[in-house]
Amino acid sequence: MKLTKTSLNGVQFFYREGYSDIKTFIEVLSNQSYLKKGMEVLNNESWLDCGGNVGAFSLLAASKGASVITYEPDPFNCELIEKNAKLNGFQNAITVKQAALVHDFRKDTTLSIAQNGNVWRNTIMKKKSNKAIKVPCLNFDEQAVLADNCKMDI
């Protein structure tokens, strides 16, 4: 899979060509979609990024001096988040947990991988998919106490 490197608003990142990655980075880093909705990220805050996708919000928060725990069930997205955190020197600010957040205490679930590169459409809902993988789960209530703020996009 080919990765292309670029930057927006001073944040560098790799994205996968032919996937929805670049659209997500533009929406979050360039268009500032979360900040336009009244969300504010302050220096020294701690955040949970629930449904981290490719890590665009995590990079945004870390660039503002916040620490972030990113939850993302797709292992390929997790690799990309870690690579981009390292690229920006944010490996101490962004912690990636490869897991689906759930309301109960199940240990794992099945993640249906979206087709056509639309990785924001991955789901743990029962859905026919050409590709599905088993992923670990974490209980949301237990994780919620770990940070001051939460961005949830799941």
Write out the residue ranges for each language-model feature:
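Phosphate/nucleotide-binding beta-alpha loop and adjacent structural elements of enzyme active sites
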Residues: 1-154
